[in-house]
A protein has these predicted regions:
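A residue-level marker of the well-folded mature domains of exported/periplasmic proteins
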Residues: 2-5, 9-10, 14, 21-193
Length: 193
């Protein structure tokens, strides 16, 4: 129970870090930015949260906290999952969201580069684009919020391998998909430990 509470608090903080700066970027006034970041920047906004795929426990906790936080500030959230954990499926989701006049899209990307054209289209339409967990490239978003440092995750994973194996034998590293940016970064970092 304690872990769930801590996870929810961390997810809520991550949500605020993802949503508030992006929506506050509408107004260039420093005072307005500060006020928006303080809590009411989601008021009246329609925000989409796009996951990698349905059924991911981490994302479901994050989505719940995201929705609670935005709705508490007067915004509306639509949580959307692609049919499959692929960039092509996320592109279909993004097409649909762009046509629905969302104010902001926050995405956990299935591919670093494949979403660029569609996310740039969204930004050209005035939609604020942010990401968390797994980032598209820098040209495809306005902000990325990382839930944990790459090296720290890699170290924790390697510590778990050591604990389980007792320091002997071989182990395999599996990723959800070959294009999963965050997981591939963790794997690369694990190889250096």
């Amino acid at each position: 129970m304690k872990k769930k509470v801590i996870s929810a608090i961390l997810c809520g903080a991550m949500v605020l870090g993802t949503v508030c700066p992006v929506l506050a970027a509408d107004d260039k006034s420093e005072d307005t930015k500060t006020e928006a970041a303080a809590g009411d920047s989601a008021k009246g906004k329609k925000i989409a949260l796009v996951g990698k795929a349905a059924g991911n426990a981490f994302f479901e906790i994050a989505a719940k906290s995201f929705q609670e936080t935005v709705e508490a500030e007067g915004g509306e959230v639509q949580v959307v999952y692609p049919e499959t954990a692929t960039a092509d499926a996320q592109i279909k989701v993004l097409d649909n969201l762009i046509s629905q006049d969302f104010d902001a899209i926050c995405i956990s990307a299935n591919d670093v580069n494949a979403l660029q054209a569609k996310l740039e289209e969204a930004m050209d339409e005035g939609i604020k684009v942010s990401s968390f967990d797994s980032a598209p490239n820098k040209d495809s978003r306005e902000i990325f919020v990382n839930q944990a440092g790459t090296k720290e995750v890699a170290q924790a994973l390697m510590d778990a391998v050591l604990d389980i194996s007792g320091g002997e034998g071989q182990f395999a590293i599996l990723s959800a998909t070959s294009q999963s940016a965050n997981q591939n970064a963790w794997i690369d970092a694990m190889k250096t430990i």
